[in-house]
Amino acid sequence: SELAGTIIDGASLTFEVLDKVLGELGKVSRKIAVGIDNESGGTWTALNAYFRSGTTDVILPEVVPNTKALLYSGRKSSGPVATGAVAAFAYYMSNGNTLGVMFSVPFDYNWYSNWWDVKIYPGKRRADQGMYEDMYYGNPYRGDNGWYQKNLGYGLRMKGIMTSAGEAKMQIKISR
């Protein structure tokens, strides 16, 4: 059974799990496996995903309880097209705010790199071009195989990593 689009125990979110998610996508040159561990103390409800380029084969897991992790994936569009997997997605949090997540796995590494970021928006906000641009052109993290952490505000913090390859893995933990 496919892992992407499912919820697992937060403690079991590992790179090995993300490797399995990548494997589910088959032989695609630009793809990403995303795992986000909810240790926020609250419940998240999926709003939507916005793909600037590329697509996904799975639905965002609808409800992510505390101590659970969501698994998601994206890939370049099928066929001989020069696109990457570039998207933002949003979860409404039980604290009344929105968790926004952005990733960019480009087609052309001569000009672009992997980038990612996480941000909390006040109130309920769906992912769209504006949310993507806000994070991509803000102060995103490079997908360089390094761990990063920051204070997200609202009593929450983030720790995460994204790999540098065209078959990318992104692992994030949101905690108090």
Curated annotation (Swiss-Prot):
GO BP annotations listed: cytolysis in another organism; monoatomic cation transport; pore complex assembly
Region (Plays an important role in the hemolytic activity): 2-11
Stretches for region Trp-rich region, which is important for the binding to lipid membrane: 104-119
Keyword Secreted applies: yes
Gene Ontology, cellular component aspect: extracellular region; nematocyst; other organism cell membrane; pore complex
Pfam family, one: Anemone_cytotox
Domain comment in the entry: Composed of a long N-terminal alpha-helix and a core region rich in beta-sheet structures. Before the pore formation, the alpha-helix binds the lipid membrane, partitions into the lipid-water interface and stabilizes the monomeric molecule on the membrane. Finally, it traverses the bilayer, thus forming the transmembrane pore.
Family: Belongs to the actinoporin family. Sea anemone subfamily.
Function: Pore-forming protein that forms cations-selective hydrophilic pores of around 1 nm and causes cardiac stimulation and cytolysis. Pore formation is a multi-step process that involves specific recognition of membrane sphingomyelin (but neither cholesterol nor phosphatidylcholine) using aromatic rich region and adjacent phosphocholine (POC) binding site, firm binding to the membrane (mainly driven by hydrophobic interactions) accompanied by the transfer of the N-terminal region to the lipid-water interface and finally pore formation after oligomerization of monomers.
Protein name: DELTA-stichotoxin-She4a
Native source species: Stichodactyla helianthus (Sun anemone)
